[in-house]
Swiss-Prot record:
The gene is lipB. It catalyses: octanoyl-[ACP] + L-lysyl-[protein] = N(6)-octanoyl-L-lysyl-[protein] + holo-[ACP] + H(+). CDD domains: LipB (cd16444). Its EC number is 2.3.1.181. GO terms for biological process: protein modification process. Transmembrane segments: none annotated. Catalyzes the transfer of endogenously produced octanoic acid from octanoyl-acyl-carrier-protein onto the lipoyl domains of lipoate-dependent enzymes. Lipoyl-ACP can also act as a substrate although octanoyl-ACP is likely to be the physiological substrate. One of its GO terms (cellular component) is cytoplasm. This is Octanoyltransferase. Belongs to the LipB family. It comes from Rickettsia rickettsii (strain Sheila Smith).
Amino acid sequence: MIRFITIPDFADYQVILKLMEDYVNKVINDHEPEIIYLVEHSEVYTAGTNYKQEELLNYGDIPVIYTGRGGKFTFHGPGQRVIYPILNLDSPNRYKDLKLYIKMLEEWIINSLNYFGIKAYIIKDKVGIWVKVRKDEFAKIAAIGVRVRKWVTYHGVAINISTDLSKFSGIIPCGLENSLVTSLNQLGIHVEMSEFDKIIQTEFNKIFK
């Protein structure tokens, strides 16, 4: 069974990035076991490899870090559960298929949200996980941005639990102008991070066998 490691407190993004990269190297070179980091970051904007500078609007005192993950700008901060799976897609029980991996991530998060009574969706040509907030109007509740090195995955998924959503106004989230963001709290679902973690671990084991 894959071990989930919860990082305490509000973690510095660059510290966690180095932690991930170091462990990816260990999986590749030393055949270390797969793990999943559960993180709650201190406030930071991060940019993926497809970012456009004009999508960074008004970041104030919040640091901006340019990363190697896929995607564009997003926000990380308190109240958001960030999940970093370090999985070896070139192992006997996996598939060397990045699109399939992302699809499995999406299914995992959708099923976890469904446990709390949230109907979540994938929208064609829009990355991430979405919920309907009004008729024909959707808001993003989870962002996805991954990278693979020698078929070992890192970076991952960020789910808004009780995140300060006003911080997303400093960017065009994921490059989608006029798109809405939401959280479990905003949808009326108040859950402790530890309770949410139990569900994502249970649902993970149903998808990634």
